[in-house]
Amino acid sequence: MKFFLLLSLIGFCWAQYDPHTQYGRTAIVHLFEWRWVDIAKECERYLAPNGFAGVQVSPPNENIVVHSPSRPWWERYQPISYKICSRSGNEDEFRDMVNRCNNVGVRIYVDAVINHMCGVGAQAGQSSTCGSYFNPNNRDFPGVPYSGFDFNDGKCRTASGGIENYQDAAQVRDCRLSGLLDLALEKDYVRTKVADYMNHLIDIGVAGFRLDASKHMWPGDIKAILDKLHNLNTKWFSQGSRPFIFQEVIDLGGEAVSSNEYFGNGRVTEFKYGAKLGKVMRKWDGEKMSYLKNWGEGWGLMPSDRALVFVDNHDNQRGHGAGGASILTFWDARLYKMAVGFMLAHPYGFTRVMSSYYWPRNFQNGKDVNDWVGPPNNNGKTKEVSINPDSTCGNDWICEHRWRQIRNMVAFRNVVNGQPFANWWDNDSNQVAFGRGNKGFIVFNNDDWALSETLQTGLPAGTYCDVISGDKVDGNCTGIKVYVGNDGKAHFSISNSAEDPFIAIHAESKI
């Protein structure tokens, strides 16, 4: 009995790091600003058949409606209440999405905005997605309800009430982030209200949460809230399962708050990942792909089993958040596909793929003055995600997760899951290759000259279909074929002018 108790205790301690994905699924996608009805359809028609593990959804709670500028994406990060009522849909639509996605083995992870409410300067009234009244001036949010007792006004020690110095951890946690009213998360009443909201979502069937602005909350306050959370719904999850937690902590080094303070609560977003990988792919600061041999902890990244990794996210793809100009996005499609391919092939971290929408970028003095633009819409009503005959998306939805190269690398990651990093090769420059045990092999050419090499793949002999240039269809290959000999070696030729200068083969792409 003692042994059993110890085991269950260990299981409980580790549970918040487990994404509870269906067996063999390893990557989630952020369907940024998608409507619940579209996500439900996407789970059934695309994500499940292609082996995606789950979806990070935009904040589902009621938020402020901002008219100047007109309906920006960031209004969803200014809560008014915890009613499930946003431009992505109402509670019935949310429930239907969670049901339908779970039923095909695709998990839902909610972006939970629990550090703050709306901005201090917002006008009192009912300009909210569900019409709830609020008055920021006197801290009145009857939709929760919160009042003046529930905010950190008295605790913050700066004259402005806002964060003025990121070298002061207390300011970062107790003062207002960008003028947003900071909740007093050390108060049990506030913790209970936040936990009630999250428990409502857990009972509906979500698998976990991205905790927005975790850097701006004390790790102990987060833990106190997590301790109040229900186990996951046993309709889809095994008894005693705890919600998967990944905390948004922007830590590029050199500040008072560090990611490792949060490891006890769950995984943490590793913002260094995309910033550093972007520099390598762009060949900035003398970086080159050959240096990626010890990618991961060897590059000063957090422990792999604590990291949630991504090439870009909804913030830094438009210059917000962290990472700066090195971040690769769909605007840099060729390098972006290579970077996402590298991420999905490499064993480090738990991976998230971005799915974006188009906006009219307009750089003035180095800043995109349209970085606020919200999702494709008709008079503020979010447009449906239409699907074109070639399986790309219409209505200005980018849908990177539907790009063949990215979709097929999600499958690659599933196939090689658990296999060791192996058979590294590089040319001391920007041509590199590596394998995952005897299940997969990938080759990159990011140099300005052709690659022509015979490499040890570690794979069994046979003919393989390159899943970057094509697909395995009815036992044949629509792309490049790779011939692996009895010695495990194969010859690779990649032109530096190829549309996608990388090749990937795996056990299930064998013809």
From Swiss-Prot:
SMART domains according to UniProt? Aamy (SM00642), Aamy_C (SM00632)
Give the signal peptide as a residue range, or say none if absent.
1-15
**CDD domains listed in its UniProt record:** AmyAc_bac_euk_AmyA (cd11317)
| Classification via SUPFAM superfamilies | (Trans)glycosidases (SSF51445), Glycosyl hydrolase domain (SSF51011)
**Cofactor: how bound:** Binds 1 Ca(2+) ion per subunit. Binds 1 Cl(-) ion per subunit.
Active-site residues per Swiss-Prot or TrEMBL entry = D212, E248
Modification type Pyrrolidone carboxylic acid: residues: Q16
Provide the primary localization.
secreted
- Annotated site residues (Transition state stabilizer) in this chain: D315
Tissue specificity statement from the Swiss-Prot or TrEMBL entry: Expressed in liver and saliva.
**Keywords assigned by UniProt?**
Calcium, Carbohydrate metabolism, Chloride, Disulfide bond, Glycosidase, Hydrolase, Metal-binding, Pyrrolidone carboxylic acid, Secreted, Signal
Q: List locations, semicolon-separated.
A: Secreted
Q: Which GO terms fall under molecular function for this chain's record?
A: alpha-amylase activity; amylase activity; metal ion binding
Which cellular components does GO assign to this protein? extracellular space
Q: Which domain of life is it from?
A: Eukaryota
Cofactor(s) the protein requires to work: Ca(2+); chloride
- Which residues does Ca(2+) bind? N115, R173, D182, H216
- Positions with a binding annotation for chloride: R210, N313, R352
Is Signal one of the keywords? Answer: yes
In terms of InterPro entries, this protein maps to: A-amylase/branching_C, A-amylase_C, Alpha_amylase, Glyco_hydro_13_cat_dom, Glyco_hydro_b, Glycoside_hydrolase_SF
Q: What class of enzyme is it?
A: hydrolase
Q: What is its EC number?
A: 3.2.1.1
Tell me more from the record: Hepatic and salivary alpha-amylases are encoded by the same gene; however, their mRNAs have different 5'-UTR sequences.
Q: Which family does it belong to?
A: Belongs to the glycosyl hydrolase 13 family.
The record's section on PANTHER family has: ALPHA-AMYLASE
**What name goes with this protein?**
Alpha-amylase 1
Q: Which organism is it from?
A: Mus musculus
What does the record give as the organism's lineage?
Eukaryota, Metazoa, Chordata, Craniata, Vertebrata
Q: Which gene encodes it?
A: Amy1
